[in-house]
Amino acid sequence: MTPILNHYFARINWSGAAAVNIDTLRALHLKHNCTIPFENLDVLLPREIQLDNQSPEEKLVIARRGGYCFEQNGVFERVLRELGFNVRSLLGRVVLSNPPALPPRTHRLLLVELEEEKWIADVGFGGQTLTAPIRLVSDLVQTTPHGEYRLLQEGDDWVLQFNHHQHWQSMYRFDLCEQQQSDYVMGNFWSAHWPQSHFRHHLLMCRHLPDGGKLTLTNFHFTHYENGHAVEQRNLPDVASLYAVMQEQFGLGVDDAKHGFTVDELALVMAAFDTHPEAGK
């Protein structure tokens, strides 16, 4: 077994077999989502997010941090390829907030070809991300551990939607064109540095739970969801509490010499927002 697989399996607490089949893909997808949190802290610190072969693995796997789509799906793609899966990355345009104009390609997702079928896998779309692969088939409702999704085909494009309280909400649109490393670097740079990028204006964190729930942080506001409904919400009183919740609830590593961060560094990040613990939303 290669070093990255050893490290990755230890990170997600995987001890089973890893055959190249749909059962393995489903199990790894869910394990990843439930162990490695989505988070954008490096954008805010700020630290440059590197996408070379080693950097995402060092950060998300070795240092036990989280990351966003370019890192999350970059690591997952490499793991799947090491296992023998036929996988490649795609780039999508995020339309979740109904933008007035077509946005740039800033979301990385995965296309897996397996057993004469094509599947979409995505461990990096935050709180609404897939937690299981879905078939690349149009207008088919597909159930995952955390909700229902469907794909719609519009010409050469595909649109991923999720069922939000009986209303279908579009998340992003993509095509199947092959992308280059420079395309991911460009999308990553734009996401981290464009002044209006939402990653620059809020602390965002999410970890899914095996029972179908999820935990989220938006600035100082912590929420625990079950079956799509909030069962616990609280505003954390101070940065020390936020720092503790990141470690205890999201499993975030903070001690790594390169990728860790101190409570004082976190305090500087949170002071930059036009919000305070009592009103964190």
Swiss-Prot record:
**Can you tell me which residues form the catalytic site?**
69 (acyl-thioester intermediate), 107, 122
Q: How does activity depend on temperature?
A: Optimum temperature is 37 degrees Celsius.
Record localization = Cytoplasm
Swiss-Prot/TrEMBL catalytic activity = an arylamine + acetyl-CoA = an N-acetylarylamine + CoA; an N-hydroxyarylamine + acetyl-CoA = an N-acetoxyarylamine + CoA
Q: Which UniProt keywords apply?
A: Acetylation, Acyltransferase, Cytoplasm, Transferase
Record note on pH: Optimum pH is 7.4.
Name one molecular function that GO assigns to this entry.
Answer: protein homodimerization activity
Keyword Zinc recorded: no
Maturation and modification: Acetylated on Lys-214 and Lys-281. Deacetylated by CobB.
InterPro entries in the cross-refs: Arylamine_N-AcTrfase, Papain-like_cys_pep_sf
- The modified positions for N6-acetyllysine read 214, 281
Highest rank taxon of the organism: Bacteria
The entry's cellular-component GO terms read: cytoplasm
The keyword Phosphoprotein appears for this protein: no
* EC number per UniProt: 2.3.1.5, 2.3.1.118
Query: What would be one Pfam family of this protein?
Result: Acetyltransf_2
Q: How is its activity regulated?
A: Inhibited by salicylic acid, acetylsalicylic acid, 2,6-dichrolo-4-nitrophenol, N-ethylmaleimide and iodoacetamide.
Q: What happens when the gene is disrupted?
A: Deletion mutants show marked resistance to nitro compound mutagenicity.
The record's similarity note reads: Belongs to the arylamine N-acetyltransferase family.
Q: Which PANTHER family match?
A: ARYLAMINE N-ACETYLTRANSFERASE 4-RELATED, N-HYDROXYARYLAMINE O-ACETYLTRANSFERASE
Summarize subunit and interaction data from the UniProt record for this chain.
Homodimer.
Known role: Catalyzes the acetyl-CoA-dependent N-acetylation of aromatic amines, and, probably, the O-acetylation of N-hydroxyarylamines. In vitro, catalyzes the N-acetylation of various arylamines such as aminobenzoic acid, aminophenol, aminotoluene, phenetidine, anisidine, aniline, isoniazid and 2-amino-fluorene. N-hydroxyarylamine O-acetyltransferase activity has not been assayed directly, however, NhoA activity is required for the mutagenicity of nitroaromatic compounds, suggesting that it also has O-acetyltransferase activity.
| Name of this chain's protein | Arylamine N-acetyltransferase
Lineage per the UniProt record: Bacteria, Pseudomonadati, Pseudomonadota, Gammaproteobacteria, Enterobacterales
Gene name, per UniProt, is nhoA
